[in-house]
Amino acid sequence: MKIAALTDIGSCRQENQDNYCARQLTDGTGWGIVCDGMGGANGGRVASAIATRTILQYFDRQLPGVNPGEEKAFMMRAFDIANRAVYDKATSDPDMLGMGTTGVCVLQRGGLAHIVHAGDSRAYLWHNGAIRQLTRDHSMVQQLVDSGQITREQAALHPQKNLITRALGVSASIVPEYNRREISPGDILMLCTDGLTNMVADAELGLILQETAFFDAPGVLVDRALKGGGQDNITVLLMGVETTEGTNG
């Protein structure tokens, strides 16, 4: 597996409240996490940093002992621990009250991508020239789309499009969403914050991944989001599948 990533403050924000981390292991396994913090003052930046650091520490300690078929429980537990870490900070420090963060995490091993997420940061799969969104936004407008009250096109312009319904750290417990997908050599998994997807349409994301060298693609994607307005922090994490050998689940 190969990894390329980039984060940018954008054109309209005073600080970057996004965070990310990724690891490439010797057996072909790899994982990555992207978080988009929220909260006044420094709360969003702190929340995303705590969540990312907690996930990193948990994966470093526990992933080597995860057997095939245990990936879902492992990743759900990781989000539960990260949620508690952010929540404990938010409720113990008055300056951090109300902070939280989205999170989208992918574990790639043995021909499968295991995905857990909370919020509207997304995972995509680029496969054979086509891009597909793997996650469903936990947001107010997504609920309106799902119920047929508005279209996806209307959702992109909705005044409440940034109102999320699930996030790490806003309550004592969380129920993240898990799914998994088969992956093949040559595929690209992309994790990103809404600073990218609010500025660049899915079709253009796929075209950029198809036409751009892997390690150049994060820069091209971020630049395109900046040219589109750069209204939020922008984070892109790419994981290129080079082999599907290793532990299968």
Q: Which residue ranges define each predicted feature?
A:
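PP2C/PPM-type serine/threonine phosphatase catalytic domain
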Residues: 1-249
